[in-house]
């Protein structure tokens, strides 16, 4: 039976592993928000951890809103933070998967 008759008319495709699909899906959902996308770009270019207070000033958002965005980025495995006094300082995770790092680097 010809491939076309079996419903296969193209070159076979290679699918991503299920775990990788779930991981990339979470990353892409987190980056789908314009504010979070810009926050990740800022963190990518930063030479040291960035204080949440700097995001509050830069975006004109409340501290709880910025913290919500950072929590979403943390849940997606993109950022880590440390508490210093009353503020949290954030940076991109150093152990990002290669595909995630390449995606972030491609942001410009």
Please describe what each predicted stretch is:
Residues 57, 74-75:
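Alpha-helical residues within the helix-turn-helix
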Residues 18, 22-62, 84, 88-95:
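N-terminal helix-turn-helix DNA-binding core of bacterial DNA-binding proteins
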Residues 101-108:
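Short, charged, intrinsically disordered terminal tails
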Residues 95-101:
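Short, charged/polar, Gly/Pro-enriched secondary-structure boundary elements
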Residues 67-71, 86:
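Base-recognition residues in the alpha-helical recognition helix of bacterial helix-turn-helix
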Residues 1-31, 76-78, 104:
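N-terminal leader segment of winged-helix/HTH proteins
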């Amino acid at each position: 039976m010809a491939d076309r008759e079996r419903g296969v008319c193209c070159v076979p495709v290679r699918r991503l592993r299920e775990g990788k699909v779930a991981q990339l899906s979470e990353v892409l959902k987190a980056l789908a928000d314009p504010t979070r996308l810009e926050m990740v770009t800022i963190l990518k270019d930063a030479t040291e951890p960035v204080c949440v207070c700097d995001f509050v000033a830069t975006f004109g958002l409340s501290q709880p809103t910025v913290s919500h965005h950072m929590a979403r980025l943390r849940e997606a495995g993109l950022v880590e933070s440390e508490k210093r006094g009353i503020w949290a300082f954030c940076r991109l995770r150093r152990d990002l998967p290669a595909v995630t790092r390449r995606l972030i680097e491609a942001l410009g």
